[in-house]
Structures are given as C-alpha cells and as structure tokens.
A protein has these predicted regions:
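C-terminal motif of bacterial Sec signal peptides marking the signal peptidase cleavage site
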Residues: 17-20
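Bacterial N-terminal signal peptides that target proteins for export
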Residues: 1-10
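Noncatalytic, solvent-exposed loop/strand surfaces
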Residues: 22-37, 43-471
Length: 471
C-alpha cells in the first residue's frame, strides 16, 4: 500500500494569469533558411547514405525515455576504432542533450538558437528565438550567456518539440512549442511564476511529458544567490491557460535543478529531487533535500528524505545533484552531493529515513543510466556500476577512471561516457568499466550526456556537437 506520509503536505497549485504578450497563438522569432552550418568541420567524408539508419529508434528526450534509462536497444554492436565523423560548430555552447526525432537531430544552444540536422548531419532548419541573458544581468551563475540549458522534449501527439529559453533584457523564461519538421513556433508562453525573481531562477532540468502536460523544473543559478525557490511547472500540451505548479513549502531554496529533470514512473507520476532549503536542525520538515512524487495535479503524494536532511540543508550537501533512476517498477536509486546512494521502493518511498538500503559510494552529479538491475552512476571521481539485488541491496561492481565523470548512456554493448574536461568520449566495457576505445570530441560542460541514434553517438560540446560512429 502506498505511503501517505506526505499526503497532507501543502502543494502550490494554481492557474497562472499569463501575460498578454505570451499567449498561445503563433509567435514569429527570426528564422534562418536551411543551409550548411557555418564553420562546420568534418573529420571523415559523409555521404547521404552514410547517416544513421532509417528506422533507427528515436531519442526524443533526455536519456531517451521519460524513465531516463539512457539505453538504446537498436544500436548495432560497437566494433573497431571509434570515428568522429562530424564536428559541427554552432552559434553557442550546447549544455542540453541533443534529441533525435523522425531522423532529425535537434540541438539547442545557449544563444537561444535551435537547429535541426538530417541523418547526414546537414542542416534542415535553424530557429533563433531571441537574445539570451548576459552574465551582468544576474547576481551569480556560471553560464554566459544563458539561453537554452534544459534538454528539450518531443511529443508525438502534437508533433512539437518543447523547450525553455531564457531571454535577456528583462530576464524571463519562455516555453516554446516548435513544429519538428520546420522549426516554426506553434506557440510560446511565459513560465515565470509569482513570488520569485526570474533572474535568480535557472531552468537546467530536462523537460518531461506526462498527463498531457509538458513539465518544466527550476532551481537556482550557480551560487544560490537571490530570491529563488524550486518549482515544477506543468503546461498543457496545447498551450492552454490551465498551468499548474508545485513548489516546496520552504522560505527559500529547494531547487529542483539536476539536468535529469523529472523522472516519470510507470504510473505517470513525476519523481523530482529537491535540493537544500531553509529548514535547519530543529525546524519542521519542508520537503527539501528530498525525493518527491507528484501526481497529475502537481500534488505531493509520497516523499523520501534522509534522516539528516536538515543538517544537509545547513551544509548545502545531500540530495539534489542527481536525478532518480528507476529499476523496473520496484526500485528507485539516487545519489547526491555527499556520498550516500539510496535505494527506495517505488510506490512507497519511505518518508524520512525510510530507504531500503544506503551505502556511501560516491558524489553523483547528473543523470544515471540503467540496464536490468545495474545502475551506472555519474560519480565525480569516475562512473560506477552498482547492482541492486532482489532485496534492494546495493553492490558496487566496478569503478572506471576518475576522469570519466559524464552522465553515461548505454548502447551497442558499451557504456558511453565523457571525460568532459579533456573532451574525450569513452566506450566502456559494461562488465569491467575498462575503456575499450576513445575519441576526441571537444570540451563539454560537466553535465554533458550524449544521444544515441543508429550507430552514432551525438555529443554536446562547448562549440556545438560532435558525432561519433561506433561501428
């Protein structure tokens, strides 16, 4: 039976009054005609027939699915030497993971620009959505300029790609629905909320789709400056006005910021992770430093927090840095900023201190990948493989090189993970963690994670994207 330890927790659920300038009608940011990407470089000749195979499984969201498993079941077996077949220089840094939809690779940059490339990585369309926010407009932060950071998501029912762009001037966050075939803006809507300063909020988490809504999560700028509170905002897929949101009932903080964004379970519920909040030892529980399960109305229906959640708040440690990884419909696994890795029971998260197992394994930042009962964690001292047995107990299987810290994905019989500082993609042996092959792709942000499509590994970099052919 599902725990209701948090059923009485207050959830901020409102219908937002949206500004007239950001209604659900079509918008018209400047478009660019299809053509070659300027400054693109290619390390191997790629003809029209050499792109990812037609019919290869799409990768329409962060780590491929709303469960964030990070697995391609159609990628052919990786063999031989990895080849970087494309290095495409775009107009800004790429923090978001690429997504792949109907054979189109969609890439968003921090310049508030979105590109679509065909299976031979030729540009199909390019859409400029406006001007990003420069660093001088914000009190803190580590991205300059700040444009599109959260990974977009595709919805097959509307045929739209959804993404959030931060715009400069009067800092604001705008949700866009783009037609996937043309890049045309179908509608856009402000997703800034009352009670906080837009310039102090950052939209880093990947967008998700559940219950006919697109879900957008918010945390703070790097440095936790100003007036911010964590948010999860749900917007109807048609851009309608019935916008709902959840915010932890804390005075300040509780950012829901990890790049994984909401994880969606088999019931269609959102599993989100709130970071440090304002409640310290002796204060009442405020749903920070927690895993929160939200229903279709953005109400908290279950939660988990470590027994030391309040002390973690005080020390700015604990949970928040890694998204929830799901093992089937039984277990949920996550690490954080301190070292403990937790196993929780799906459907009964356990409340405060109610984990099934916890072991001190590593500091984990980003999104994990899951294959069977094994979770591959993005540890700051190197990816680890951790098995969860039938009783929910953790067993570390291997630990790769301490420089390979990127959020991993799985396909073609390999674990794909980045040494982001060196700009190197590694193909790891799933059994041992040994690097079987590697290739230079260019320096990437610390949270960078690839997309998989056909035989290709598509890597976001600080210059654009690199494409590696794995077989």
């Amino acid at each position: 039976m599902r725990s209701r330890r948090t059923a009485t927790a207050a959830a901020a659920i409102v219908t937002l009054a949206l500004s007239a300038c950001s209604g659900s009608g079509p918008a018209s940011p400047a478009a660019t005609d299809p053509g070659p990407v300027s400054s693109a470089t290619t390390s191997a000749s790629v003809g029209a027939s050499s792109g990812a195979a037609a019919g290869a499984a799409d990768w329409p969201t962060y780590h491929g699915t709303m469960s964030r498993a990070g697995v391609s079941t159609t990628m052919p077996a990786a063999s031989g030497t990895l080849r970087r077949i494309q290095s495409l220089k775009l107009d800004g840094e790429v923090y978001a993971s690429p997504i792949v939809v109907r054979g189109l690779t969609i890439v968003a940059t921090e310049q508030d620009t979105v590109y679509a490339f065909d299976q031979s990585y030729r540009q199909v369309w390019k859409r400029s959505l406006g001007s990003p926010s420069p660093a001088e407009e914000r009190q803190c932060g580590d991205i300059n300029p700040l444009g599109i950071t959260g990974t977009p998501v595709y919805d097959a029912t509307t045929n739209h790609v959804f993404l959030v762009a931060e715009h400069g001037g009067s800092v604001r966050h705008e949700l866009y629905a783009l037609d996937v075939a043309s890049g045309r803006v179908a509608w856009s809507k402000s997703v800034d909320l009352p009670g906080v300063s837009a310039r102090d909020m950052q939209q880093r988490g990947a967008l998700a789709i559940a219950d006919n809504r697109v879900w957008v999560s918010y945390g703070a700028q790097a440095g936790d400056c100003g007036n911010y509170k964590g948010r999860v905002v749900g917007v109807p897929l048609d851009g309608g006005s019935n916008v709902i949101f959840y915010s932890p009932p804390t005075r300040r903080g509780g950012g829901i910021w990890n790049p994984n964004g909401p994880t969606v379970d088999a019931a269609g519920h959102l599993l989100v992770v709130s970071a440090n909040g304002a409640a310290f030892p002796g204060d009442a529980y405020d749903h920070t430093n927690s895993v929160l399960e939200l229903d279709a109305n953005a109400k908290v229906i279950d939660s988990f927090a470590p027994t030391d959640w309040a002390a973690n708040n005080q020390g700015d440690v604990g949970l928040g840095s890694q998204g929830v990884a799901l093992i089937g419909t039984k277990w949920a696994v996550l690490g954080g900023k301190s070292g403990p890795v937790y196993v929780l029971k799906q459907g009964d998260l356990g409340g405060i201190g109610g984990q099934v197992d916890v072991k001190n394994i590593c500091l984990s930042f980003g999104g994990a990948a899951v294959d069977g009962g094994v979770v591959y964690l993005p540890c700051t001292d190197g990816v680890r493989a951790v098995r969860v047995d039938d009783a929910g107990q953790l067993h570390v299987l291997w630990h790769t090189s301490d420089s390979i810290t990127g959020s991993p994905v799985i396909g073609g019989g390999r674990i794909w993970a980045l040494d982001t500082s060196a700009g190197v993609l590694h193909a790891l042996d799933p059994s041992t963690g040994r690097s079987l092959s590697q290739v230079d792709v260019g320096v990437a942000n610390r949270f960078a994670t690839p997309a998989l499509y056909g035989a290709d590994v598509i890597v976001p970099t600080l210059a654009g994207i690199a494409v590696v052919r794995a077989s």
